[in-house]
Design a protein with these regions (language model features):
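C-terminal substrate-recognition "lid" of short-chain dehydrogenase/reductases
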Residues: 186-212, 216-217
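Active-site loop immediately N-terminal to the catalytic Tyr-X3-Lys motif
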Residues: 73, 121-127, 149-150, 182, ...
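The beta1-alpha1 cofactor-binding region of Rossmann-like NAD(H)/NADP(H)-dependent oxidoreductases
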Residues: 11, 32-45, 77, 188-189
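Active-site helix of classical SDR
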Residues: 95, 132, 140
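Substrate-binding pocket helix/loop in short-chain dehydrogenase/reductase
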Residues: 57, 71-72, 79-84, 167, ...
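Residue(s) in the substrate-gating loop at a strand-loop-helix junction
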Residues: 116
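Alpha-helical segment proximal to the catalytic Tyr-Lys
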Residues: 100, 145-149, 203
Length: 218
């Protein structure tokens, strides 16, 4: 299955992911746009569909997100809106656009939303991020019921502390002590769960939020 990789500004990192997929024997292409800009999304997908008249997106992974951490009484309007625009509104814009073609085909489809432990339990200093991810979880459950009759499944994955660019500035040694397994998770571990939810084996699973956090629930 060819992979379409969206990115906003980091072309070098996106190209590295593309190369990794191709080195493993897969096919991939880049599709740059700002997930918070509905006009940019429509233009990019219109162009992609024009270039691929016989193809359609069967699996959508909503993974766009940013952090602008701050305690609420010091949080600026831009810190609040930037996080919700990318993390929550981006999910809405992209999913709405692709559902227009995913649903009428009646071939089924997979939507996997990357939520977060922050959206499950809330994290201090992340009221904006926690709100966006909690809303994403609610939207996952609602949308799953809306599209189930078209054989489209919608699920969410809620990672805890994972070794990514978004957690690079966090004190990993200290935070690992909070995790019963004693370590951060890896992107490969999250990817394996996403791959399962996107597979035929998960065709009867929908509306679920699956935590992957090393036992960190409270």
């Amino acid at each position: 299955m060819p992979v379409v990789i969206n990115y906003h500004s980091n072309h070098e990192a996106a190209q590295a992911v593309k190369q990794e997929i191709e080195d493993a024997g897969g096919m991939a292409e880049l599709l740059p746009f700002d997930a918070a800009d509905p006009s940019a999304i429509d233009a990019a997908i219109d162009q992609w569909e024009e270039n691929h008249p016989d193809d359609h997106v069967a699996v959508l992974v909503n993974n766009a997100g940013i952090r602008r951490d701050n305690v609420m009484f010091m949080m600026g309007d831009d810190e609040w809106h930037q996080v919700l625009d990318t993390t929550l509104n981006g999910f809405f814009y992209i999913t709405r656009r692709l559902l227009k073609h995913m649903m009428p085909r009646r071939r089924g489809g997979r939507i996997v939303n990357i939520a977060s432990l922050s959206g499950v339990k809330g994290m201090p200093g992340q009221a904006n991020y926690s709100a966006a991810k909690a809303a994403l979880i609610g939207a996952t459950k609602a949308l799953a019921q809306e599209v189930a009759g078209r054989q489209v499944t919608v699920n969410a994955v809620a990672p805890g502390f994972i070794e990514t660019d978004m957690t690079r500035d966090l004190p990993q040694d200290e935070l690992s002590k909070l995790v019963p397994m004693g370590r951060f998770g890896t992107p490969d571990e999250v990817a394996a769960l996403v791959a399962f939810l996107a597979s035929d084996q998960a065709s009867y699973i929908t509306g679920e939020v699956i935590n992957i956090n090393g036992g960190l629930y409270t």
